[in-house]
């Protein structure tokens, strides 16, 4: 496959006004995508965005570019990423476009595409779009220009879709839930979903102003929701990230429930109902505790590379349905085509209701093992991981950890770093093992 110049593993992303994230590129990208997408299909594209102040600028630029290529554009306004995927399918659009940098600060933004079935755009189509970007922009004739309209009921459509994933014979009456929207795209969606299902909802991170997205709130900053759950005496908390495709939870004791624990709950519930197909896909960073807990239930477990794109690829390869990352990207292909924080939360709540159990009770059988990550910077072209000294240190640690431990060494994809991750039963022992390997990496670099 050819090397991609613009698209990364999750679209195009960067600091606004520099590099690739400029209005000029967005205009040209809209036109290039329109040229490729107009070759077949309905000539209709949906655009959604999160709450960053730069979203308006990029929305206008993309809209102009797509229109110049002859495509009709339907604007959703601020809506979660999974909502764009869902409405792309239901409107039979040729593609969906999301303007978001997910969990990044407000000064970053990004653009990613969904295909007509709500999945991430095929690599070959991204390469075709990149090829068009190299050409001069040529507007279609005036009578062929695309029109622009707004989906007035996008919010209501998506709220009903989310609620449809909860059992019709159950409610959330009697539950007090703190919902943290990260001042992001779910601010007008998530609280309404859980309230309409009957819960008492305390919303935080629900007042976006364009520059406060993910600022000390949301799934990547859990201190505030943990504190709020305790002070409000809530049963649990649900924290979403800026574009709503990631979830972390909090139990009534104020303890964080991460993506690995959520996967365990969903797998156990699916197995109990006889609907679990195959096993569960995690990543190289998934806690060993998840692997061991699933083994105890005879549920297969497989690891992909880090990134929800790779989780999806392995799910499709194995024909399994449930997978995700410890960071909170949760995929359940029986309930959608992409990670959806709100729907994942609903599925956990459904499991709680079906089993008449608390979040603490559902996660109790899974023991999270201590995990230590040490980053070691290196210079030059030499690969420290090929060093005999590093290999010997890794082998020594692995032999001492045995079946209840794990070592992972990998290069960072963005920085000159070797990431040393060690898991085991005792935190101090794990820390010592991680430092032993890190010292070997340092001496080899």
UniProtKB/Swiss-Prot annotation:
One of the Pfam families matching this protein, by short name: PGM_PMM_I
Post-translational modification: Activated by phosphorylation.
CDD domains: GlmM
Metal-binding listed as a keyword: yes
Any one GO molecular-function label of the UniProt entry: magnesium ion binding
One annotated GO biological process: carbohydrate metabolic process
InterPro entries: A-D-PHexomutase_a/b/a-I, A-D-PHexomutase_a/b/a-I/II/III, A-D-PHexomutase_a/b/a-II, A-D-PHexomutase_a/b/a-III, A-D-PHexomutase_C, A-D-PHexomutase_C_sf, A-D-PHexomutase_CS, Alpha-D-phosphohexomutase_SF
SUPFAM superfamilies: Phosphoglucomutase, C-terminal domain, Phosphoglucomutase, first 3 domains
Residues holding Mg(2+): 102, 241, 243, 245
PROSITE patterns noted in UniProt: PGM_PMM (PS00710)
UniProt catalytic activity: alpha-D-glucosamine 1-phosphate = D-glucosamine 6-phosphate
Gene Ontology cellular component list: cytosol
Record family assignment: Belongs to the phosphohexose mutase family.
Official protein name in the record: Phosphoglucosamine mutase 1
Gene this chain is encoded by: glmM1
């Amino acid at each position: 496959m050819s090397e991609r110049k613009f698209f990364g593993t999750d679209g195009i992303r960067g600091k606004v006004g520099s590099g690739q994230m400029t209005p000029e590129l967005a205009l040209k990208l809209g036109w290039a995508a329109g040229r490729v997408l107009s070759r077949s299909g309905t000539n209709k594209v949906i655009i959604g965005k999160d709450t960053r102040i730069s979203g308006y600028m990029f929305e206008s630029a993309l809209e102009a570019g797509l229109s110049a290529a002859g495509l009709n554009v339907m604007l959703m306004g601020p809506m979660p990423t999974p909502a764009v995927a869902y409405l792309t399918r239901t409107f039979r659009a040729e593609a969906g476009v999301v303007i978001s940098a997910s969990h990044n600060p407000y000064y970053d933004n990004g653009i990613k595409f969904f295909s007509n079935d709500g999945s991430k755009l095929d690599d070959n189509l991204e390469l075709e779009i990149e090829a068009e970007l190299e050409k001069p922009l040529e507007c279609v004739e005036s009578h062929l220009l695309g029109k622009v309209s707004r989906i007035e009921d996008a919010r209501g459509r998506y709220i009903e879709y989310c609620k449809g994933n909860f059992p019709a014979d159950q409610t959330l009456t009697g539950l007090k839930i703190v919902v943290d929207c990260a001042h992001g795209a779910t601010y007008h969606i998530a609280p309404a979903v859980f309230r309409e299902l009957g819960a008492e909802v305390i919303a935080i991170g629900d007042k976006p102003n364009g520059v406060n997205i993910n600022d000390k709130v949301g799934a990547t900053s859990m201190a505030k929701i943990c504190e709020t759950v305790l002070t409000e005496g809530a049963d649990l908390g649900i924290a979403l990230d800026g574009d709503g495709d990631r979830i972390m939870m909090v139990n009534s004791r104020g303890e964080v429930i991460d993506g690995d624990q959520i996967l365990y709950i969903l797998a156990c519930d699916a197995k109990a109902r006889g609907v679990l197909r195959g096993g569960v896909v995690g990543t190289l960073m998934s806690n060993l505790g998840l692997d061991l807990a699933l083994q105890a239930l005879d549920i297969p477990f497989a690891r992909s590379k880090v990134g929800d794109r790779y989780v999806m690829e392995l799910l499709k390869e194995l024909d399994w349905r449930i997978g995700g990352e410890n960071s909170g990207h949760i995929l359940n292909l029986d309930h959608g085509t992409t990670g959806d924080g709100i729907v994942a939360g609903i599925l956990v709540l459904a499991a709680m209701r079906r089993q008449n159990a608390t979040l603490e009770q559902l996660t109790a059988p899974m023991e999270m093992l201590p995990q230590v990550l040490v980053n070691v910077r290196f210079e030059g072209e030499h690969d420290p991981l090929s060093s005999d000294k590093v290999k010997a240190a890794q082998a020594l640690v692995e032999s001492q950890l045995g079946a209840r431990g794990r070592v992972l060494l990998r290069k960072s994809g963005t920085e000159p770093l070797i990431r040393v991750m060690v898991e085991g039963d005792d935190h101090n022992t794990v820390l010592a093992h991680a430092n032993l390997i890190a010292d070997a990496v340092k001496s080899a670099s």
